C-alpha cells in the first residue's frame, strides 16, 4: 500500500488518480498511525517552503515519517515535497527534513532574459543514475512538467538522479538510499510520469 501524505498543501487527488492508473493500491494518510501502516510513502507539496514544513510538523505525521525513512521504507517527495527532503531553502528560514543533504536556491536569470521565473512547462531531463529502480523503463529522452522557482544543489553529486538545464544545470531529481525526490510533477507528465510512478510502486 502506498500512502500519500495529506497535510494540507499537496496535490493529493491527481497523484492518487495517477497511482490508480499504475494498478497500485494507494490511500491518503492523515495520521502517524495510518502512515506507519503503509509500505511506501509519497510526500507531495505545492507552495512555500516554510509553510510546508510548518504544516507537516503540525500534522502529527513528522515523527512517523522520520521513523519510516530510518526503517528503510521507500519515500518519494514531489515538487515542494522534494524540496522539503533537503536541508534548507533560500525561500524561508525553516530547517528541512534533512534526509538528503541539498539546499534550494532561487533561479536568477541574470544574462538569460529569455528565461522566466518560475520555470514552468515541459522540459527534458537527463538521467544520471541509470541503474536506479525509479528510472527503469523510462522512455528516452524523458520529458516532465515543471513549475518551480527554486532548484536543488546537492552537497554530494552522487545524490543527483536526474538533471535539467534552465540557465543553470540543476538536480531535477535526487536519490539517496530509500529516499527519492522529483522536482517535476509526475502526475502532470502523462506517460513519463505514469512510468515513473509505476516504477516507484513496484520498487
Regions of interest found by a model, annotated:
Residues 26-37:
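Short acidic low-complexity segments
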Residues 168-175:
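Short, surface-exposed beta-strand/loop micro-motifs that present aromatic residues
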Residues 182-203:
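Acyltransferase
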Residues 25, 40, 74-76, 143:
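Structural signature of beta-strand start/N-cap positions in the alpha/beta core
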Residues 87-166:
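Pocket-forming structural segment of enzyme catalytic cores
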Residues 2-24, 186-187:
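N-terminal beta1-alpha1 ligand-phosphate binding loop
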Residues 141, 175-179:
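Beta-strand-turn-beta hairpins that frame and shape the catalytic cleft
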Residues 47-121:
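Cysteine-nucleophile active-site neighborhood
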Amino acid at each position: 500500500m502506498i500512502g500519500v501524505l495529506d497535510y494540507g498543501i499537496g496535490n493529493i487527488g491527481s497523484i492518487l488518480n495517477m497511482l490508480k492508473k499504475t494498478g497500485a493500491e494507494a490511500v491518503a494518510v492523515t495520521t502517524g498511525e495510518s502512515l506507519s501502516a503503509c509500505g511506501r510513502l509519497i510526500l507531495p507539496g505545492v507552495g512555500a517552503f516554510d509553510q510546508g514544513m510548518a504544516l507537516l510538523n503540525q500534522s502529527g505525521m513528522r515523527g512517523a515519517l522520520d521513523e519510516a525513512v530510518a526503517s528503510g521504507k521507500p519515500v518519494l517527495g514531489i515538487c515542494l515535497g522534494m524540496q522539503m527532503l533537503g536541508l534548507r531553502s533560500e525561500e524561508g528560514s525553516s530547517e528541512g527534513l534533512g534526509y538528503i543533504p541539498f539546499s534550494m536556491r532561487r533561479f536568477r536569470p541574470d544574462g538569460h532574459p529569455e528565461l522566466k521565473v518560475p520555470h514552468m512547462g515541459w522540459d527534458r531531463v537527463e538521467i544520471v543514475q541509470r541503474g536506479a529502480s525509479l528510472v527503469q523503463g523510462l522512455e528516452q529522452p524523458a520529458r516532465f512538467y515543471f513549475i518551480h522557482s527554486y532548484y536543488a544543489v546537492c552537497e554530494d553529486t552522487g545524490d543527483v538522479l536526474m538533471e535539467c538545464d534552465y540557465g543553470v544545470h540543476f538536480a531535477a531529481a535526487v536519490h539517496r538510499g530509500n529516499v527519492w525526490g522529483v522536482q517535476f510533477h509526475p502526475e502532470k507528465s502523462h506517460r513519463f510520469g505514469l512510468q515513473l510512478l509505476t516504477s516507484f510502486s513496484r520498487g
